[in-house]
Amino acid sequence: MNRLPLLVAQTVLVLAALSAFGWVVKHRTKGDLDLGWGNVVVDQLAGFPDLFKKSVKEAQTLPQTYVPTPDGFDPINRLTEDVLALSAYSNEDEDRNIDLWNLRTGDVVHRWTLRRDVLDFKVHRRVHHPLLLEDKSVVSFITGREPLFRLDSASNMVWRQDSLLFHHAINLDAEGHIWACVQKFEKGGPWTAYRARYEMDGKTVHFLDNSIARIHPETGHIEYVKSCVDILKENGLEHLVLRSGDPMDPLHLNDVEPALFSGPFFEEGDVFLSFRNLQAVLQFRPSTGEVVRVIDGPLAAQHDVDVLSDSTLVIFNNATQENVGRYTHTAHKYPVSKEQALLKHWYSHVVEYDLASDTFTPLHEELVREHEIMTFSEGLQEPLPDGSYFVEEQNSGVLWVLGDDDVLYKDVLASHHKGHHHLPNWTRIISSFP
């Protein structure tokens, strides 16, 4: 059978349909054709190429506040008790929502919105580690930039503090004042610089200093600032800066955790300082300027230290060298031997530190190995009342609740961009909403 006439007929019909559709679009654009309910269909079909182009461009240029969601990602929710989580993310207007939501139900309990017309920031900037106050206001900051700010329960700006660069973490002390990881600005402008140096073999090594600051929650006024380099120098600990593999950023302060009560090993008002690149946590007493204890051992690029009891701390141990996530073996030119010593496969995990015995106990070893939990930077844990732990695997954007021998929760913050979820910004677990 000769199919040529059929093919010609089909081609003519397709061309006729395209011609008719083109004519309809032309006159819809000119505004002299009304198809009633058909207008919506025609307009959507005509706009599809623009929509497709926009989607491709969007996928190629998404801010780094979004993370690709793996194909086949399978959430888990076995929670039997409510877990309230506070975190910030980018909304469809590229403003920042700060949501308090229930991990068990997925319900949003309260939402604050930081609008870009109120506080100007670029689309890839992150609103970090929000802190809930008793009057339902929140304090947060643009990480690595100024300011620290407070929003009331209706998202109105209460105050802003622009005199320091805020980064990583903020926490409340027993008096309700805010402790923050900061860097000081140079005089004359809002920028930071190498504020410390040491000499070695005729060379001068300039490096970044960090500081800790205490902020009044009602006014945002700075009450106290202390250089971390000065803390080391005044306590005979200058040698610690030589431990780091990054000579320009040897400290990298990433948490300041106040002790809310006194115990046999610390006093109320002590602060525990986590330094990623020192591979150590320092117990510092601001009232006397004394470093009470240097906590090191099987810690590597750790983040987040919490006081669990009067004798125990918990620390999020990233268990990585600071640059392994950035470089691969191709950075080195040595050949690979056929006979290699094999060390363990490392995963990020929570570790308990006993202040009495100076010993470390890793938690959830089998679970983190089974689920390959790993974040080269950032990451945190929060102990929950039932003995389980909330864990933020920050680089992948996966949120976990780990029981003693089972995963109770695993999910991501779904975004309005298909195939992508939100990068978490140091989620805080809240015991109750005021």
Place the predicted regions along the sequence by residue:
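Positively charged n-region of N-terminal signal peptides that target proteins for export
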Residues: M1-P5
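Histidine-/acidic-rich catalytic cores in large beta-rich domains
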Residues: L6-P434
